[in-house]
Amino acid sequence: SYYHETNKDLKYATDKSGSWVTTSIDTSGIVGHYTSIAIDSNDDVHISYYDVTNAELKYATDKSGSWVTTSIDTSGNVGYHTSIAIDSNDAVHISYYDNTNGDLKYATDKSGSWVITSIDTSGIVGIDTSIALDSNDDVHISYYDYTNDDLKYATDKSGSWVTTSIDTSLYVGYYSSIALDSNDDVHISHYDLYNGDLKYATDKSGSWVTTSIDTSGNVGAYTSIGIDSNDAVHISYRDTTDNELKYIGLDSSSNVLGYSVSPDLPAGLSLNIATGEISGTPTALSINTTYTITVRNSGGTNTTTVTIVVNDEIPSF
């Protein structure tokens, strides 16, 4: 699902017929921003999106055999940053941002009709929402807290909504994406705007642990996370420095698949996690230090060492 900038419509593309077919689903005004898509057990399509013209949260589905669009929440300027998920009973769950009140909101039809809830009203919260369901159909939502510049997380797994600040370092939580593994452990990727890093948070150890997993340049915007059948983590994201799409994988123990270095390289140098190349220009003096480069894939790991010293040299002509 996507927004058609020229016609201001919600569009949908699929290759289920064997070739790509595109359809204009909603053409009633300026519609289709912040779109999110999910598929139910019958392979019917469900899409949440923002209606700019009417400032509403809208929803589209083809489960009846043809496309039907519905205004779900019309109370103020609502429906930004939508994310949609389908539970084991094919009920729909949508998280989104209420721009009028600055709140994280949630809508579901699991009772048979749409019920709307304000989950977090503590400041300006709910930007960049991402939703996922666990094996019990409990809801998990990651989002950005604009007031405190934090990554936040909300869940109803205890029977009522509980919100938690996961990462409280400066300017983190942008473009969050959430997924759950086979043990219902939570995994969140997000962008650290202050440092320009891709960050990753998980509670699989029993408490939240956050890690900067790519620090090579300005990386981590527009992140998306997925978990495979072996509980390995897969994350896609933007490399703003090189204008590239990047990918990083972590095994089920949260070890980065690819290259890593320990300790941190001298200021101004960075390691390309895909190629193992060290590049950059040192910006500070550094004593003679040995760095361990580790490369890891599904077959195992290997290491090598490199020694780097940064001295203050007299300029030459």
Language-model segments: what does each one mean?
Residues 1-253:
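Extracellular, repeat-based ectodomains that mediate carbohydrate processing or recognition
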Residues 249, 282, 295-297:
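Hydrophobic beta-strand positions in extracellular immunoglobulin-like domains
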Residues 258-270:
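Short, solvent-exposed loop/linker segments at beta-strand-coil boundaries, enriched for Pro/Gly
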Residues 259, 278-282, 287:
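Conserved glycine-centered beta-strand/turn positions repeated across beta-sheet architectures
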Residues 267-282:
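Strand-loop-strand motifs at the edges of beta-sheets in extracellular beta-sandwich domains
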Residues 286-298:
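A short beta-strand micro-motif common to beta-rich folds, especially ectodomain repeats
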Residues 300-312:
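C-terminal edge beta-strand
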Residues 313-317:
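Proline-enriched interdomain boundary motifs that mark the N-terminal boundary
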